[in-house]
Amino acid sequence: MSTTISTQRGQVYIGELPQDFLRITPTQQQQQVQLDAQAAQQLQYGGSLGTVGRLSITVVQAKLAKNYGMTRMDPYCRVRLGYAVYETPTAHNGAKNPRWNKVIQCTVPPGVDSFYLEIFDERAFSMDDRIAWTHVTIPEGLREGSVVDEWYSLSGRQGDDKEGMINLVMSYANMPAGMHMSPPVVLMPTVYQQGVGYVPIAGVPTVYNQGMVPMGMPAAPTVAAQEAPCSEEDLKALQDMFPNLDREVIRTVIEAQQGNKDAAINSLLQMTEEL
């Protein structure tokens, strides 16, 4: 029970203070903002709790409609899946026909069924120029163990689906409970502009490398990821059988089939029939 006494400086409390002393009750909007922030952090940093599988995206090559600028373009790709952003190396002097053959391993949060892909021209003395973009829906057949090798239309200055095409090879693997993947991701604030898409807000992006945990987030136990066995002997044998397919594409298929050579051959045969 608290009592009040008067002093030269005014009234003061003596004894127990009320539970809401010096506390400001948040409004409904503030509570919603806090809940949204917590949900975003769980998707962004959460390991096994929010992850349902691993999506492997091989960015093979692109055939663009136009070379913008006076010199040959230096294109690179940026993939945004959930709250994570991944980039390929720059294809220097790639111009209209850049080749990357970059394999990107992405964790897929619950409820995410698509990703956003952009192609930029790397500039030395100015902002990188965005050339093309597309929104890719993750094929349902991937969860059944198939490998998808498709060309996707790109939108850009030439118009919707008129900026060229990009070749992607995708596979999907379920992750055992407790497995935690923490590849380097680039976290960039974005804003949606009508007719343009998601555009990065000016500023320095925050990069979290493997092993780094943002302040205030619990450190998830690191479990070594069990990579599918892919021996050089099997890789060379399949490369001899399918000389028209890229080496990294064959490696991705073998890993997606958990090292099962017969299953990998069937998937590669299916891919060559579709080419």
From Swiss-Prot:
Top-level taxonomic group: Eukaryota
Transmembrane segments: none
Family matches, as SUPFAM superfamilies: C2 domain (Calcium/lipid-binding domain, CaLB), UBA-like
UniProt keyword annotation of Glycosyltransferase present: no
GO biological process entries: autophagy; inflammatory response; innate immune response; phosphorylation; ubiquitin-dependent protein catabolic process
Keywords, ordered alphabetically: Autophagy, Cytoplasm, Endosome, Immunity, Inflammatory response, Innate immunity, Repeat
Cell location: Cytoplasm; Endosome; Early endosome
CDD domains given in the database record: C2_Tollip (cd04016), CUE_TOLIP (cd14363)
All copies of domain CUE, residue ranges: 230-273
Role description: Component of the signaling pathway of IL-1 and Toll-like receptors. Inhibits cell activation by microbial products. Connects the ubiquitin pathway to autophagy by functioning as a ubiquitin-ATG8 family adapter and thus mediating autophagic clearance of ubiquitin conjugates. The TOLLIP-dependent selective autophagy pathway plays an important role in clearance of cytotoxic polyQ proteins aggregates. In a complex with TOM1, recruits ubiquitin-conjugated proteins onto early endosomes. Binds to phosphatidylinositol 3-phosphate (PtdIns(3)P).
Family: Belongs to the tollip family.
Subunit structure and binding partners: Interacts with ATG8 family proteins (via AIM motifs), and ubiquitin (via CUE domain). Found in a complex with TOM1; interacts (via N-terminus) with TOM1 (via GAT domain); the interactions leads to TOM1-recruitment to endosomes and inhibition of TOLLIP binding to PtdIns(3)P.
The protein, known as: Toll-interacting protein
Species this protein is from: Salmo salar (Atlantic salmon)
